[in-house]
Amino acid sequence: MLHMPIPDAGVLARRTSIAAHLRRMVPDHAVIDSEVSLKAYESDGLTAYRQPPMLVVLPQTTADVSAILKYAQAENIKIVPRGAGTSLSGGALPLADGIVLGLAKFNKVLDIDYANRCVVVQPGVTNLAITRAVEQHGFYYAPDPSSQIACTIGGNVAENSGGVHCLKYGLTTNNILGLEIVLMNGDVVRLGGKHLDSDGYDLLGVLAGSEGLLGVVTEVTVRILKKPESARAMLIGFQSSEDAGQCVADVISAGIIPGGMEMMDRPAIHAAEDFVHADYPRDVEALLIVELDGPP
């Protein structure tokens, strides 16, 4: 059972003045304080736990984020950054005496550099939108969480998201080249860049998966890849989950890295088949769905 911290009564008593101060930093409509509107931010995808935040603010520039964080630190106000709220881990669960910093308005693709095989985007750009921006030139962004149509790249960095293809192509941390982040004192720093061997310490791995605890991401440089010439999927049935697991181990130990590999046990097979009617076989105990990509 998750126990939320007891709200700071002193901060809650200043709610009206805090909202007024925020409205001097961002447009009036970018501060959300009505009870009805705050309901939309009371949880992320982990809906078993929910509570409305004290306020929500929707900045549109790095300068906005910096000013808000400086103010929050000076006034001892808690901040919870939020992308699209698709996480199932509670990473964007708000605090009753805190401000949710919604980054949905940061949704621009800033630069596409095919020569260096990278794209610079704002954190509110969705995962799938990156691929959509480059696919006409034969490129794509490899990490593909199941929520890729909705989840944002900023949230992917915060959660170090993966997906079906992470076995071969890695998680978010393996596919980001640079970040612009705003520290909790409002300072803006840049880490990495378009080139693999950028100067300075490699702190990107520390930030990937930190859920906004170390700073707020305001710009991301991601690696893009050429689309494989072909991709084929196969479905393999097994009489036990142990046999399926051993098959995975045998494939990897043979030095073969499929583009994607997913295993389903009997309950998952039946649940999926009842819902989507994908024509999965019901007479097996486990399934491996394997994708092979590369030359035809």
Listing of model-derived features with the role each one plays in the protein:
Residues 260-296:
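Terminal amphipathic helices with adjacent charged low-complexity linkers/tails
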Residues 2-4, 49-55, 234, 285-294:
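Short, hydrophobic beta-strand segments
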Residues 89, 100-103, 213-221, 295-296:
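Short, acidic (Asp/Glu-rich) active-site segment that either coordinates a divalent metal cofactor
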Residues 1-70, 74, 86-117, 146, ...:
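N-terminal flexible segment immediately upstream of the FAD-binding catalytic core
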Residues 39-40, 87-90, 127-129, 224-226, ...:
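Flexible loop/turn segments at secondary-structure boundaries
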Residues 108-264:
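FAD-binding subdomain of flavoenzyme oxidoreductases
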Residues 80-82, 91, 122, 144:
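Structural motif
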Residues 1-14, 36-40, 57-58, 63, ...:
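Feature of Fe-S/electron-transfer and energy-metabolism proteins
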